[in-house]
């Protein structure tokens, strides 16, 4: 929370690098501690550990190359604040369902981190690492199946919130590159993107 506030108030190069370092740590923690240790009994836990490990490596690459500048973008503030609130709604919904730790969803579990990251990148979306977005949106689609398989209705929050975010990220990307020649054209790509998000 402190780094996020500082990123809004004093977006210095040091704060931006600290936020990226925190994202490396957080995604590595999910990969190693959460999936390899605490979820060791689950089937295919190592695949999920690799998935989150790749996201950690993408953030590490971003930290080294300074690809994502974290430039503030006010266009999607309302959706951003909703996404920021969701990691705190997750535990409340679990608690309302009568669950207690360690069975309840917490703020540092994969879905909560995915929602927070999408909100953060949407707030600073002048230029973002689309690879991180693609991985997180893929994770959000997996969340639909988790609702039924693991009986976690809270994951509907992640899945439903990411669909408009996916559209906005790519629309923003195409809007910034309208002057460039693309096949198909940016106009048709935008319509394809709308169709995919609706589907």
Across the structure, where does each feature detected by a protein language model lie?
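Membrane-helix boundary connector in multi-pass membrane proteins
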Residues: 37-41, 122-134, 141-155, 174-184
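N-terminal topogenic module of multi-pass integral membrane proteins
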Residues: 1-40, 199
């Amino acid at each position: 929370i402190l780094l996020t506030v500082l990123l809004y108030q004093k977006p210095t190069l040091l704060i931006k690098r600290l936020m990226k370092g925190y994202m490396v740590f957080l995604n590595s923690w999910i990969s190693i501690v959460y999936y390899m240790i605490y979820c060791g009994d689950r089937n295919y836990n190592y695949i999920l550990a690799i998935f989150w490990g790749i996201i950690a490596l993408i953030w590490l690459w971003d930290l080294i190359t300074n690809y994502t500048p974290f430039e503030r973008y006010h266009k999607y503030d309302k959706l951003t604040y909703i996404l920021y609130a969701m990691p705190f709604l997750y535990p409340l919904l679990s608690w309302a369902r009568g669950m207690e730790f360690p069975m309840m969803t917490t703020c540092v579990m994969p879905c909560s981190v995915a929602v927070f990251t999408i909100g953060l990148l949407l707030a600073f979306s002048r230029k973002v690492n689309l690879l991180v977005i693609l991985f997180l949106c893929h994770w959000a689609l997996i969340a639909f199946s988790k609702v039924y398989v693991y009986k976690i209705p809270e994951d509907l929050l992640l899945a439903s919130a990411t669909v408009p975010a996916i559209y906005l990220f790519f629309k923003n990307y195409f809007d910034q590159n309208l002057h460039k020649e693309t096949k198909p054209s940016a106009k048709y790509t935008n319509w394809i993107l709308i169709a995919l998000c609706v589907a």
